[in-house]
Design a protein with these regions (language model features):
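Intrinsic disorder at enzyme termini
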Residues: 1-16, 159
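Short amphipathic alpha-helical coiled-coil/interface segments
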Residues: 16-17, 69
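Surface-exposed helix-capping loop/turn segments at secondary-structure junctions
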Residues: 24-31
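Glycine-rich flavin
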Residues: 31-180
Length: 180
């Protein structure tokens, strides 16, 4: 495996570094007083369920930042070019993550489509993948279960075919983005 960044990845790393320095770090003092719900990278799932107007004020700030990042080409980073992404390598994504970790603001770049990206086929690409990439839909991910934790070999949830649909039967503990 080549651990060197391509010229495009080096350029992207510098863009992310500038975004963090110019957009995120200046907001750190304001976010120091933010509700605890914004701790960690999975704040979206919890924050959207809140009735607290203060939480929704921070959500608006984050949504503005997401739109700015997308406008600057800092979105769809690991999505293949054929779907409108930048097709950044794993090493490139590590460089991006290193830059994002230089701020205490819990900010991520992208819509988390990697879980469905390589498994969608035919009509599923148009129905699920592309709307997620465009930000029209959000994918949810549920691995953890009460009896198995996050061990995929011990999963008990089943998906039984039922005509054109599936009947899903089981319990998940921490389904990411299930509220969307």
């Amino acid at each position: 495996m080549d651990f060197h960044l391509s010229k495009a990845e080096e350029s992207l790393q510098k863009k992310v570094e500038a975004f963090v320095r110019e957009e995120l770090i200046p907001l750190e003092p304001e976010f120091e007083g933010a509700p605890d719900i914004f701790e960690g990278s999975r704040w979206k799932s919890r924050a959207k369920l809140s009735c607290d107007p203060e939480v929704h004020r921070y959500i608006k700030i984050m949504e503005r930042l997401e739109k700015k990042a997308e406008a600057e080409g800092l979105w769809y980073l690991d999505v293949p070019k054929e779907y409108g992404g930048l097709d950044i390598s794993n090493v490139g994504m590590i460089a991006v993550t290193e830059e994002l970790e230089k701020t205490s603001i819990p900010f991520e770049l992208g819509n988390h489509v990697s879980n469905i990206l390589y498994n969608c086929q035919g009509e599923q690409i148009e129905r699920f993948l592309l709307p997620c990439i465009r930000g029209e839909k959000t994918s949810a991910f549920g691995l953890s279960e009460p009896a198995s934790g996050a061990d995929p070999s011990m999963l008990q949830t089943t998906a039984t075919p039922d005509g054109d649909d599936f009947i899903i039967n089981g319990t998940k503990m921490f389904p990411t983005f299930a509220d969307r």
